[in-house]
Amino acid sequence: MQSERQKYIRNFSIVAHIDHGKSTLADRLIEATGTLTEREMDTQVLDNMDLEKERGITIKSQAVRLIYKRDTGEEYTLNLIDTPGHVDFNYEVSRSLAACEGAILVVDATQGIQAQTLANCYLALDNDLEIVPVINKIDLPSARPEEVKQEIEDVIGIEAEGAPLVSAKTGLNIKDALEAIVNKVPAPDGDEKAPLKALIFDSYYDSYKGVVCHIRVKEGTIKEGTEIKLMNTGKVYEVVEVGVFVPNYMPVDELKAGDVGYVTASIKNVRDARVGDTITEAKRSANEALSGYRPAVPMVFSGIYPVDGAKYEELKEALEKLQVNDAALSFEPETSIALGFGFRCGFLGLLHMDIIQERLEREFNLDIITTAPSVIYKITKTDGTLIELTNPTNMPSPSEIKLMEEPIVKSSIITPSDYVGAVMDLAQNRRGIFKDMQYLDTTRVSLNYEIPLNEIIYDFFDALKSRTRGYASFDYELIGYKDADLVKLDILLNADIVDALSMIVPRERAYAKGRNMAQKLKEIIPRQMFEIPIQAAVGAKIIARETIKAMRKDVLAKCYGGDISRKRKLLEKQKEGKKRMRQVGSVEVPQEAFMAVLKTEE
């Protein structure tokens, strides 16, 4: 049922490929509805983190309430929920979409549809949202709005004839976009008197208020003093404040079915208010939670160690602080013979890992070493037990392994047709299995591959961009596990295994990879007073070796002429000394060596 009040509410989000102008459009909508004064307008209002502004990407979901007055005098409340566009934050997108009834699909008039446009669009369709296409950047000379409209109809299959043509940069036709939202996005429904049901679509920690949950009320009413229960954890809290975003907090008396806002209830830890969870009343609970909750599952693991061992506690505190705001980050302590004490951290993907590392270095001033990222392998041992392996050093010996499986992703790559050969070549080099290809228009092709996740976590994206001059776009999702013939590649320095450099590789590539790494390390590790052999080994078998020559003092400098036996005695003595040194000496491995492992080119 729909109340009179709900008829004037529209909840929508904006989805787009990276750089198609999503955050800029959000700025224009905020400006056009007069939500912020000129003085408060800051470019990309909703991207709060410096990192977000610098990289030009949206990382956390944000929300803002706009009041739009139509020419007829009616006032509409538009709740805009800004979502991240990057594939790593896919699950943030899906929860933000679950809080809406409609989505604006922003498509760049010069580039047309890209891989993430499709991925996010399908996510929106999965959530039964009404999709409103908006074509952006029409002020650019290379814009081709008519062709892009046709493309939207052909590829996605949604009506794009009346799509507003806007320029978010100059503010052209923004009113058309607002009208389209009011006309096309359905109004919310939901009984205001029913038991409370509210979806948490984002939560983060505020040092004064505790955890602030961004919520969309689906049914019922929530106000200060209500006793609430989180359906997933079963914990009960009392509401301290409810309010709306204009983009800053503005407390209100109550939020009713259909509203989007925030609630604080002195919750101490973001883990207790997990994104996707349902809030209900403690006394009058809803029968079942809202669907679509799934905990964030890390896909990529990496070890993070402080460069200075004494900073271990600081690193732990920093990770805990980041985790308060980022429920997708997981970490547990681990030790490495080479690097000392540190943490094994789990991330959603590479961008997520990159951002966490950068935030540790920036916001907490920590010097850290990160090890090569790895994925979760499933191993069935000969005695029938199943283990999940996230750290290559813990891999059981080959005689104990009956079966080893690795995660496989379904990836779609959209590329200009000139580069199809180069892209196919890259995918095959990365053990990709070709599934199908379709032409989106005369110039662009969508290729679908199944590729092992471990092949794309290093530098697949960079390689793809360089082979297509930056034109290809890429999107992936995990589809399951497949058996694989994998071995553990160890690196030995001076006959000692350096555990932090171990990695899991396909058997047929072990030799090439080992040789490559040995050469790379030879260039990076500085010469010492004694000779250092660098060896790559699979099991007990050495497959590659390089030697770093020792630095030598010229012990013959003081012999002018003289007998050969005198010289030989001095050289033998030097050799003995070097030999003794080598037995007790340890090798310092610079941070670059750990990074080099990741960047070995095939």
Swiss-Prot record:
Keywords: Cell membrane, GTP-binding, Hydrolase, Membrane, Nucleotide-binding, Protein biosynthesis
tr-type G domain sequence ranges: 7-189
Single GO cellular component term: plasma membrane
Function: Required for accurate and efficient protein synthesis under certain stress conditions. May act as a fidelity factor of the translation reaction, by catalyzing a one-codon backward translocation of tRNAs on improperly translocated ribosomes. Back-translocation proceeds from a post-translocation (POST) complex to a pre-translocation (PRE) complex, thus giving elongation factor G a second chance to translocate the tRNAs correctly. Binds to ribosomes in a GTP-dependent manner.
Organism encoding this protein: Clostridium botulinum (strain 657 / Type Ba4)
Superkingdom of the organism of origin: Bacteria
Stated family: Belongs to the TRAFAC class translation factor GTPase superfamily. Classic translation factor GTPase family. LepA subfamily.
PANTHER family linked to this entry: TRANSLATION FACTOR GUF1 HOMOLOG, CHLOROPLASTIC (PTHR43512:SF4), TRANSLATION FACTOR GUF1-RELATED (PTHR43512)
Residues given in the record as GTP binding sites: D19, H20, G21, K22, S23, T24, N136, K137, I138, D139
Coiled-coil residue spans: none
NCBIfam families: lepA, small_GTP
GO MF, one example: GTPase activity
Protein name (record): Elongation factor 4
GO biological process, one term: positive regulation of translation
EC number(s) from the headed UniProt entry: 3.6.5.n1
CDD domains named among the record's database cross-references: EF4_II (cd03699), EF4_III (cd16260), LepA (cd01890), lepA_C (cd03709)
Topology relative to the membrane: Peripheral membrane protein
InterPro entries, sorted: EF-4, EFG_III/V, EFG_V-like, EFTu-like_2, G_TR_CS, LepA_C_sf, LepA_CTD, LepA_IV
Catalytic activity, as annotated: GTP + H2O = GDP + phosphate + H(+)
